[in-house]
Amino acid sequence: MTLDKWLFDKKDQIALLEQWRTCAQYGMTTKDFCQKLADSGSSSSKKIGQAGLKAPGQGKAFTEVLEGWLSPVVLSTLVIAEKNGQLQQGLDLAIKELGGGQGVMKALFWMMALPMATLFGLGVLGVYISGEIITTADLAGSMASQVRELVKGPGLMVLCTLTGTFALSAFSMPIWTGQSRALVDKLWPFCDYRTAVAGNLLSTLANLSQAGMSLKAAMKEVQPHSSRYLTAHLQRMLSHLETETNPGRALDTGLLLADAQTNLNVMGDIAPLTTLLEKSAEQHHRHLAKKMATLQLIVPKVILVLAILLLGALVGSAMASLFISIQL
């Protein structure tokens, strides 16, 4: 993969597909679209447009030119839709696919970054202020000194342990599989990661299904581009499909929310596959959005309160010890 393709991120991909969709809506051919890109696009878009103009002479379709520029699953959606004569619908689905996805760990990181930095900053400030008071007033061995040493020693160790545990959890989530993972998947933040993965998978399968893929083919398309964690679930789902015709029971690997899984099991033999997958994906996304909103409301405030209490304990104990020493 070239550097240009590697730097062509999700926003660039969406912008490209939206341009293509607009051109298609105005009745422009793919050749016209490629010419437009070659004449007035960004440097990356110009390369795509120029390659697209050369593609027919090389016996290629334009979608083949997009290999490496678009994510594999999105490209598969376009290829299948184009084969079925539904390119515009395929573009809609591809844009929808790129616009999906919920980075749980990223969201949690940004949710906690500022409060944790504030906690650390106020802790350092409190240690410094109390240290200056202790040194100036010769309060060694006092209550203030003991509180300061507690924060500097065990307190700092606890903070580092919590930070390390969170970092280790983030690292292990995409790769940890097996029975032990099934147990921790019920605990936070693993349960939120599982819900996000399930919602994104269901959305992708729904998009591929709407483009014309069977459930089995869609899973096989997604599998090579999945994390080790999701791959393990997909392998079990594909195994279930060997003997199971009900999509709900085929998807029953412990990945989905219990309520959503029950709905899929009941409706699997009745509802259209695409509708079934879309509704289940929406259920997972709603559940996660509600959970994240609750965490956003509570967690930062709790951390900030702890930071204020920590600063108050350090400075307050120093002032109290100073007052006692003056009285004596």
Regions found by a protein language model. Give the residues of each.
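Transmembrane-cytosolic junction motif
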Residues: M1-D12, L168-V197
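Low-complexity, intrinsically disordered or weakly predicted helical/coil tracts enriched
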Residues: L53, K60-A61, I134-A144, R181-D185, ...
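Glycine- and small-hydrophobic-enriched helix-loop-helix hairpins
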Residues: W6-M105, R194-Q296
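N-proximal short alpha-helices
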Residues: W6, K60-E64, E149-L156, C160, ...
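Bilayer-spanning, highly hydrophobic alpha-helical transmembrane segments
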Residues: G100-S172, R286-L328
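Short flexible/disordered coil segments
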Residues: G164-A167, S172-G178, K220-P224, G254-L256
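Short charge-dense sequence patches
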Residues: M1-T2, G41-K47, L150-L156, S169-S172, ...
